[in-house]
Amino acid sequence: MTNGSHIMLDCTGAVGIDGDWMLSLMKKAVDASGARRVHSHIEKFDGTLSPPGFASVVLLDESHVSAHCYSDIGLLAIDAFSCGNTDPARIIEAIESEIRTKFPG
């Protein structure tokens, strides 16, 4: 029995990824997938309590898409989960394509 599908993407060398750009990209990918956005939020970290970077999330009617960036080590971890009809792989593929275009190599 399956209760959903979970896809993850880790990007290294993610230096200079802007949190607002990432959240906008996530929303665009969600909208293109046909999923219904419920809420979105970004939290930027200055390194005081957490490592510098950001965490962003787009809540979906059927689950979520999130991204966590650790700018001090250049790591961007993205995941998409759906317990509905939305294919999270489609969301991740759209995000990855835009990241590769903006940050080739």
Label each PLM-derived region with a short phrase.
Residues M1-G105:
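Polybasic/polar functional segments that serve as interface/processing modules
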